[in-house]
């Protein structure tokens, strides 16, 4: 898991060590900041999350997409030479500013529904870059409404936490298990990058992920007689 601000050379050095010295299949967990500030701000704003506050600091300090792509190509080749698998875990939570005393700190970490439109775009970019040949594990806003599509697109393992913190708790896993029970499991043969592109394209208008507008209550007093 790449902590915010972790230098690219350190990420590559750690992953290379795990592959060549420890002989481990290795996945690097990336941060949503890799999308760039302008894209993240624009996509969240368009979906009703304009109240979520963040600046460009983490976007500037974190791993950049232009550095990540060649590094992941190198690590994938290194893993293949060692008879191992290399892939990405998408994604870490997203740091945002505390503005209403939600927590006794300056930052908190966004997950769940609002994270999905960012993480699925990360999956789209990397899946297209590698034409589906790079393994992707998913964790950014996976839930009942997208887990089947993710799995069928060749993205797995899929992990989740936020959805089981909602009403129903661990009981939601039964619902998810029943949904996936009808999916055929096949050995990894590539990510369907065209299917992932469609998921990302649809995300900004998918009502499951749009922040609903709450109408202000009618405070007008009735006319007196």
Task: Name each model-derived stretch.
Residues 1-9:
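Active-site beta->alpha loop and helix N-cap motifs at the rims of alpha/beta catalytic domains
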Residues 8, 12, 16-27, 77-82:
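Secondary-structure boundary elements
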Residues 126, 133-134, 138-143:
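Glycine-rich adenosine-cofactor-binding loop
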Residues 36-132, 167-185:
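Glycine/Thr-rich beta-alpha phosphate-binding loop at enzyme active sites
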Residues 185-225:
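Ferredoxin-type iron-sulfur electron-transfer modules and their immediate structural context
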Residues 30-36, 92-96, 140-146, 162-166:
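Active-site-proximal loop/turn and secondary-structure-junction residues that shape catalytic pockets
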Residues 12-16, 142-160:
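Catalytic cores of alpha/beta
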Residues 25-29, 83-89, 96, 133-137, ...:
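Structural preference for beta-strand elements that scaffold enzyme active sites
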